[in-house]
C-alpha cells in the first residue's frame, strides 16, 4: 500500500468514526463536545418551563404539516412572537398519524355506541419519553395507564394522582420533574391471562412463561431451545450488544458506563451493527436456528421486519417492554394535537397541500428563483386545495420554513433548487414501513368475562345457548339441531344476537360472509383479561383489548388485527369492508365463536400506507441507511429546516417528533437575520401577511 493510499484509508476511517460518534450523539441527545450538553434537559426547559429565548426581529415562518411536530414547533415559535403559518393538507383534522376514531358533531358515529373511540395510530406513551408526557401534563390532559400486559383490576391504586414526569440526566445526575411524587399511586399487578396461539397450539402468556415447550415445539425447536421463552432468547442474544455501553449488576439490572465509555460504546454499536438486519443478527451473530428465528419473529412480532435494520428492532425492544410503564390519554390520543391546535387557530390553514417548494440559499452559487432571492422572501411554498391536485396554486412566502411531513410524502413535491445530494438521497431512499389496524366493536366486554359471565349473557339470549357453544366436534347438521329453537330464525343468525345489539346495523355484506363461512369456531376458555394483548400466527397477528372501559358503557372496541410491514400488506390488498369479516373470523379462532353474539357490525380500519398524506406508517431504516444518510436527514437546507419522527432516531414514536420539533424551533428562533429578506410582519398574523397570497399555475422546477 502506498503512502497516499494509506493516508486516504486513514482519512476515511477517521471520517467514519466521526459519523458513528455523531450518530450516537443524535440517538442519546448529547450536544457537541466539549460541553456535551444534555439536549433533553434543554428541550424540556424550552418545551415546558421557559419557552424560546427572546428573538431578534420577528420572522415570517412557514411550517408544512399540522402533525404533532408542526404543532409543537408552531406553538413555541408563535409564543416567542414570530409570525407563523402552518399549512396542513388534510381539510378535516390535525394530528397526522395521531388519529382517533370518534364521534364528531354532525357526522355519523364510527361505532354503534357514539361514546366509544379507538386509536387508528399512536396509542401508547412509555414512561421514558419525558417530553411527550410532560407536554400532556402541561396542556392539562388526563393521562392514565395503558396496559401492555393485562392486569388484576383488584390491585393497585390508579385513583391516586398520577406520578410526575421524571428525567435523570447523564450529566452529573441532574434531575428534572414537573411535580411532587405521588406515593399513593400504585400500578396493578400483571396477570398475563392473554393468549399465544401458534401452530394450532394455544396457551396463556403466564403458562408460556413457565413452560414454553408446547408452543416452541410447534416451531420444531429442539433441545435447550424448547425450554426458553423467545423473549429470553432475544434478551440473551442482545446482552453482548448491551455490554458495549452498560454494565450488568448482580441483581440483573444494568447501569450505564461512565459518560465517555457510554458514548463511545454506543458509537461502536452503530459501527458494528448498522449493517445488520434483525434476521441476519439472529442467524449469524446470535447463531439461532431457522426454527428459533421463526418462533422469535412470530411471538415477538419481528417476522415482517426481519429484513429491516437491526437497530430499529433493538431500540424497539427497549421501547415496547412488558416491564415498562405505559400511558394513554383519556379521551384518545387525538386530544394532544387538538389541544395544541386550539391556540393556533389563526396560524393553521387547513386543506392546503404543498406541491412546490422554492428557497433562496445565498451559500449556494448565488441561486435565486422566480419567487425568492436577495432582498425578497427566502422561502416560497405553493399549495393546492385538498382533492384538487390540478387546481391553480396558492403561494405562501416567508423567511424560513420547517418541513415536518414524511419524506415519503415530500418525495412528490417539486423542490427548487434541488436539495443537496445526500438530502435528496434520504428523501428518495428512506424506507417507510406499513402498519394496518382493524378495530371491531362489541356490545359487551367479553374479553373480561369469566365462564359464569358467559353463561349468564348467553343464556339471556336463549336458554341452552351457553351449552351449544360448548359443544365440540359435531358436524354442521348436529350443530344445527343443538341450536336453541328460539334463535334458529334470527335474520343475522347468531351474529349480533345479544339484545344489546341492533342487528339492523349489521351490513348485508357482513351477514352474507358470516352465513357462508365454514368456521364454526373452537371452544375456548374465557379470556378474563383487563387490557393487554394476544398473539397469533393467523393474519390478525396482534390483538389488543382496551385498558379502560368508556364510562357509562358496557361494550368496547377491540384492536382485532394489528400488523406491520409484509403482514400489513396482506390486509392492504382488501377493501375496508372486506377486512371486518376476516378480522372477526380470526379473532374467533383465538377466543371462540361465541364472541359473535356481541358484535355490533361496526368497525374501523386504518392503513397508513394507503393514507395519501402519510404514505406509510413511519420511517424504519434498512441496513446501512442510518450511517449512509441520517446525519443529512437532520441538516437544514439553507432556510429550510426539518422535523418529524423520521428526523429523529426514535422512529414511529411521538417523542421523536416532539424532540425534533423543539430542536427546529430553537434553530429557527436563533437563525441570524441575513441576506434573506427577513422582515417584521405587519398587519395581520400569518406568513402571507407581508406578501398577499397570489393565485398562479404550478411552476416546474
From Swiss-Prot:
The keyword Ribonucleoprotein does not apply. Transmembrane segments: none annotated. Optimum temperature is 35 degrees Celsius at pH 7.4 and 50 degrees Celsius at pH 6.0 for recombinant LGOX expressed in E.coli. Produced as a single polypeptide precursor and is activated by proteolytic cleavage. The LGOX precursor is an active enzyme, but it exhibits lower catalytic efficiency and lower thermostability compared with the mature hexameric LGOX. The mature form is strongly inhibited by p-chloromercuribenzoate, but not by CuCl(2), EDTA and diethyldithiocarbamate. Keywords: FAD, Flavoprotein, Nucleotide-binding, Oxidoreductase, Secreted, Signal, Zymogen. Residues 1-14 form the signal peptide. The LGOX precursor forms homodimers. The mature enzyme is a heterohexamer composed of 2 alpha chains, 2 beta chains and 2 gamma chains (alpha2beta2gamma2). This is L-glutamate oxidase precursor.
Amino acid at each position: 500500500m502506498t503512502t497516499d493510499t494509506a493516508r486516504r484509508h486513514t482519512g476515511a476511517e477517521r471520517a467514519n468514526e466521526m459519523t458513528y460518534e455523531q450518530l450516537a450523539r443524535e440517538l442519546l441527545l448529547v450536544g457537541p463536545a466539549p460541553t456535551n450538553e444534555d439536549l433533553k434537559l434543554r428541550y424540556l426547559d424550552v418545551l415546558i418551563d421557559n419557552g424560546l429565548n427572546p428573538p431578534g426581529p420577528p420572522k415570517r415562518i412557514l411550517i408544512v404539516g399540522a402533525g404533532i411536530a408542526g404543532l409543537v414547533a408552531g406553538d413555541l415559535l408563535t409564543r416567542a412572537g414570530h409570525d407563523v403559518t402552518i399549512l396542513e393538507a388534510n381539510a378535516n383534522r390535525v394530528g397526522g398519524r395521531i388519529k382517533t376514531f370518534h364521534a364528531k358533531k354532525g357526522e355519523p358515529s364510527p361505532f354503534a355506541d357514539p361514546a366509544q373511540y379507538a386509536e387508528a395510530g399512536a396509542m401508547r406513551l412509555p414512561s421514558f419519553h419525558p417530553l411527550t408526557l410532560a407536554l400532556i401534563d402541561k396542556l392539562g390532559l388526563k393521562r392514565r395507564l395503558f396496559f401492555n400486559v393485562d392486569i388484576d383490576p383488584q390491585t393497585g391504586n390508579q385513583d391516586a394522582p398520577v406520578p410526575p414526569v421524571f428525567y435523570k440526566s447523564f450529566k452529573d445526575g441532574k434531575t428534572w420533574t414537573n411535580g411532587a411524587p405521588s406515593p399513593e399511586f400504585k400500578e396493578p399487578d400483571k396477570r398475563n391471562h392473554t393468549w399465544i396461539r401458534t401452530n394450532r397450539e394455544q396457551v396463556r402468556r403466564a403458562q408460556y412463561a413457565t413452560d414454553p415447550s408446547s408452543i416452541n415445539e410447534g416451531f420444531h425447536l429442539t433441545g435447550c431451545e424448547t425450554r426458553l421463552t423467545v423473549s429470553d432468547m432475544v434478551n440473551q442474544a442482545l446482552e453482548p450488544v448491551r455490554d458495549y455501553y452498560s454494565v450488568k449488576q448482580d441483581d440483573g439490572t444494568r447501569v450505564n458506563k461512565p459518560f465517555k465509555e457510554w458514548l463511545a460504546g454506543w458509537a461502536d454499536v452503530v459501527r458494528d451493527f448498522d449493517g445488520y438486519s434483525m434476521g441476519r443478527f439472529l442467524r449469524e451473530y446470535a447463531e439461532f436456528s431457522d426454527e428459533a428465528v421463526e418462533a422469535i419473529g412470530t411471538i415477538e412480532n419481528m417476522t415482517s421486519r426481519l429484513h429491516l435494520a437491526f437497530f430499529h428492532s433493538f431500540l424497539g425492544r427497549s421501547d415496547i417492554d412488558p416491564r415498562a410503564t405505559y400511558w394513554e390519554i383519556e379521551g384518545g390520543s387525538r386530544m394532544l394535537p387538538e389541544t395544541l391546535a386550539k391556540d393556533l387557530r389563526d396560524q393553521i390553514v387547513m386543506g392546503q397541500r404543498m406541491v412546490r417548494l422554492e428557497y433562496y440559499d445565498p451559500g449556494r452559487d448565488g441561486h435565486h428563483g422566480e419567487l425568492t432571492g436577495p432582498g425578497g422572501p427566502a422561502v416560497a411554498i405553493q399549495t393546492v386545495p385538498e382533492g384538487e391536485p390540478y387546481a391553480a396554486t396558492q403561494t405562501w412566502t416567508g423567511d424560513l420554513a420547517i418541513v415536518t411531513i414524511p419524506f415519503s410524502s415530500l418525495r412528490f413535491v417539486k423542490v427548487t433548487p434541488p436539495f443537496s445530494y445526500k438530502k435528496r438521497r434520504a428523501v428518495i431512499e428512506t424506507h417507510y414501513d406499513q402498519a394496518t389496524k382493524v378495530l371491531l366493536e362489541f356490545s359487551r366486554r367479553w374479553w373480561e368475562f369469566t365462564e359464569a359471565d358467559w353463561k349468564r349473557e348467553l343464556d339471556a339470549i336463549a336458554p341452552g345457548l351457553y351449552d351449544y357453544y360448548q359443544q365440540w366436534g359435531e358436524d354442521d347438521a348436529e350443530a344445527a339441531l343443538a341450536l336453541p329453537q328460539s334463535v334458529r330464525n334470527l335474520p343475522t343468525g347468531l351474529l349480533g344476537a345479544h339484545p344489546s345489539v341492533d342487528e339492523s346495523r349489521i351490513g348485508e355484506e357482513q351477514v352474507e360472509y358470516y352465513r357462508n363461512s365454514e368456521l364454526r369456531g373452537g371452544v375456548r376458555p374465557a379470556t378474563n383479561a383487563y387490557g393487554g394483548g394476544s398473539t397469533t400466527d393467523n393474519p390478525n397477528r396482534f390483538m389488543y383489548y382496551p385498558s379502560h372501559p368508556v364510562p357509562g358503557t358496557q361494550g368496547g372496541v377491540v384492536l382485532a388485527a394489528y400488523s406491520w410491514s409484509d403482514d400489513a400488506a396482506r390486509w392492504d390488498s382488501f377493501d375496508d369492508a372486506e377486512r371486518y369479516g376476516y378480522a372477526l373470523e380470526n379473532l374467533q379462532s383465538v377466543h371462540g365463536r361465541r364472541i359473535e353474539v356481541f358484535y355490533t357490525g361496526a368497525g374501523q380500519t386504518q392503513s397508513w400506507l394507503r393514507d395519501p398524506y402519510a404514505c406509510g406508517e413511519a420511517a424504519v431504516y434498512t441496513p446501512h441507511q442510518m450511517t449512509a444518510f441520517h446525519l443529512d436527514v437532520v441538516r437544514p437546507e439553507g432556510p429550510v429546516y426539518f422535523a418529524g419522527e423520521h428526523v429523529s432516531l426514535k422512529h414511529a414514536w411521538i417523542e421523536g417528533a416532539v424532540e425534533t420539533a423543539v430542536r427546529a424551533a430553537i434553530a429557527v428562533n436563533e437563525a441570524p437575520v441575513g441576506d434573506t429578506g427577513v422582515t417584521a410582519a405587519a398587519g395581520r398574523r400569518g406568513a402571507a401577511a407581508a406578501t398577499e397570497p397570489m393565485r398562479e399555475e404550478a411552476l416546474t422546477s
